[in-house]
Amino acid sequence: MRVALLSDVYFPRVNGVSTSIETFRRELPGFGVQTLLVAPTYGGESAAPDLIRLPARPVPRDPEDRLMGYRAALALEQRLRDEAVDLIHIQTPFVAHYAGLRLARRLKLPVLATYHTLFEEYLHHYLPVAPSGALRGIARRLSRGQCNALDRVIVPSQAMAKRLASYGVTTRREILPTGIPCAQFAGGNGAGFRQRLGISPTRPVALYVGRVAFEKNISFLIEATDRARATLPDVLLLIAGEGPARAALAAQVAARGLGENVRVLDYLDRSTELPDCYAAADLFVFASRTETQGLVLLEALAAGTPVLALAEMGTAEILAPGEGTVTSPDDPIAFASLMADLLTDRAWLAALARAAPTHASRWSDQGLAGRLAHLYSDVLAGHAPRN
């Protein structure tokens, strides 16, 4: 089987969508599925036979992101025909979505999409002058129209499936999270990572990994760290990632006098640096309210690092009492109290750390890729070309 993946985002842009695409592309050939990825160019990427880079333009207010050229995407029609593509799988709801739909109609192919992101909660961060209620309504209507034009919609969590149903999406929804390569995150050199950063082996360290964006609610973690230092004066919050909220968060850190308690790192290489970073932390902390899955929580658990998080949207489906995770109320005071308790109680942390890898193994990359391959076959078997 040959599947064309269309996405407005891919590496070197680091986020959950890029990671999901890479994970499935790596594992699907083991199930008889070859992929051809169509993605924007960011400049300087090396060529690959199974990856087409299209001219792209930056997204306003978020220069890290790109939108592929619509006409350039449609010009791939003959290439996809020559490649004997069987199915089109859209990964983003922007230019890639509309180009993917058009190509599928022209080629009479089935088309499905993964709904990775809860856009109704994101738009107001990027269009702050517009009323947030109106933007949410627009996002819901757009999502409904986009999803109902597909043969199938993949969502990474039950919470996201319910949200799309509330929009009026009638297309069949399949719950299929992205898996993780658990072995890749096990056995990181945490002591070496601490030494490289000049962090004492005994200092209590909490870690956030991910995009430094407003919707990730990192300001909540900074406030919680500020409150936790009343009990643990040397507590350290590491923030590993980049994004449009860095300047605002730096201002918050300065205003609270947290220069010695919060450090912001750049993006870390997923295979060579990130496992060491997870292993260096005593606790992984996460406060996003809009995650459709929360891959970084699983990565931390696979590394044996306990997780403290809010149980919101897809994150709630990962959190399980006693399975390496602790759930906090959506309140920075309560979060800070749990954070301090965990970092102080080494026996509790150790018990959670022992349970964490087993819990993470339920999201194995191979197992979930096999489910996706089966879904592709099911969609192909039931496909009747639309007008």
Q: Where are the predicted features?
A:
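Short hydrophobic beta-strand element within catalytic cores of glycosyltransferases
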Residues: 306-309
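Aromatic "clamp/platform" in nucleotide-sugar-dependent glycosyltransferases that forms part
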Residues: 289
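Conserved acidic donor-binding segment of nucleotide-sugar-dependent glycosyltransferases
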Residues: 320-333, 341-346
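A short helix/loop element that forms part of the nucleotide-sugar donor recognition site in Leloir-type
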Residues: 186-199
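A conserved mid-protein helix/loop that constitutes part of the nucleotide-sugar donor-binding site
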Residues: 19, 204-230, 237, 244-250, ...
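N-terminal subdomain of nucleotide-sugar transferases
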Residues: 1-56, 366, 377
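Nucleotide-activated donor-binding/catalytic signature segment of Leloir-type glycosyltransferases, i.e.
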Residues: 247-268
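Short alpha-helical donor nucleotide-sugar binding micro-motif in glycosyltransferases
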Residues: 80, 147, 267, 275-281
